[in-house]
Structures are given as structure tokens and as C-alpha cells.
């Protein structure tokens, strides 16, 4: 709905800015994080917020919201691959198997769209880049959360994300305020619900079980993308998509079970 009034630059900025205000009101105390760590917080603000938020908003100009959510469900694959290849984190062979079956489920859900091959354009590519960006950010943020806590880490990362989104917005677009009639409620929902509450919950999960194990919860995103796409946007869900969703749920459960 927000795309009816706002462009991708504006959506990216407002959802980060609203989330930043919300989280900073939750914790008004001064955060003492060494300046040497701020480059990593800035990376998180860029790779977890400013860049993927813009990419997903831009992608949904040409693909359905359901398809964008389904592609987002591939994020755990990239988190695991990047953790294994770049950050040398170990996962068992059986966990690799469940990641593969989870990806298979996402594949089935994606190809359940009758027009998937037509949709596989620049929008799908941008959504895939956003998922890869999440993969790097999740691995970078894990030690920050361990050392400084989930709330403090998110608080500063959102500040950097808002700053970088504003820098990208000013030369490329204009500062149009969301209106009550069209985009204000969607932006409040994205800002408070997603950038605020959901990210804080996910950061706490990363603190408890790590980026790889915590990322398996992202497999739930395609489920709600399909459901909400059908309810609010009348996007079609086929039988093969339901089969794919079932595989995703089973894979997520088994992966978490083995991790525990």
C-alpha cells in the first residue's frame, strides 16, 4: 500500500526512522560502545536496513509482495553459506540437509506462481540481493549483540541506517510525508512492528542461539507473505505452494531441533 504514495527511497527512510525513534524511546540511556566498533554498527545499519529495505521496496514495483516474501525466505541459506565460507562457523551435515530441503520448499512455493518466469526480472534480482545483504549483516551483528546486548546494538544500528537512508533519499527523491489516508499506517506498522519489535526479537534470538540457528525462523516469512498477499491483495496461492510451505515448516523445525 505504501508504494501507492511513496517511492522506495522514502519507504526505506521512514520505516528505519520510525523504528529508530521507537527503539530509542525504549532505551533513553546513553550507550557506551567503543568507536572502533562503530564501523561494524554502520555496516549493520547499511546491510540490514538501508540497503535491503530499499531493494525490497524497489523490487515490489515489478513483482508481487508474495514473491518478494518468498525470495526473502532464502535468507537463511545465505546466512549459513556466509557463516561457513567467510566466518568459518561450523554446521553439521544434517543441518546442511535441512537447509537444502528448506530451500527446496521455497523453490516449490515460488514456482507455484503461474507467472513466476515472467516475474523473474529485475525485481526478483533486487529481492535476491537484499537477502544476500541480510546474510552478511546477520553474521556481522552476532558478536556485537554478544558484547553489547541486542537493544543497544539495534539502537545504534538504526541510527546509522536512518542516516544512510536519508543521505540516499535527498539527492534521489523528496521528503514527502506519509498521509493518514494512504501510507501512514503501513509505515507505522513497518517501522514499529518490523524495524522495531521484530528486529529486537530477532536480535535477542541471535544472542541466544546464534545467527545460523536463529535465521531458520526466516523460513516463516513466506508463509505469512502468501497468506497476507491473498487476504489483502488477492494474490493466488496454488496447491504446490501449500506443499512447499509444509516442507519449509518441517525443515525449520528439524533444523532447530538438531541445533538444540
Protein language model annotation of sequence segments:
Residues 23, 82, 91-113, 131, ...:
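Hydrophobic transmembrane alpha-helices of multi-pass small-molecule transport proteins
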Residues 13-14, 53, 67-74, 140-163, ...:
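Helix-helix packing/entry segments at the starts of transmembrane helices
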Residues 7-8, 64, 87-91, 149-150, ...:
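A helix-boundary/kink motif common to multi-pass secondary transporters
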Residues 7-25, 43, 94-104, 122-129, ...:
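Hydrophobic alpha-helical transmembrane segments of multi-pass integral membrane proteins
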Residues 3-4, 60, 87, 145, ...:
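Helix-capping/transition residues at the boundaries of transmembrane alpha-helices
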Residues 24-72, 108, 191-209:
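Specific transmembrane alpha-helical segments of multi-pass solute transporters/efflux pumps
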Residues 46-50, 54, 77-81, 107, ...:
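Hydrophobic/small/kink-forming positions within alpha-helical transmembrane segments
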Residues 1-5, 61, 65, 110-122, ...:
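Membrane-interface helix termini and inter-helical loops of multi-pass transporters
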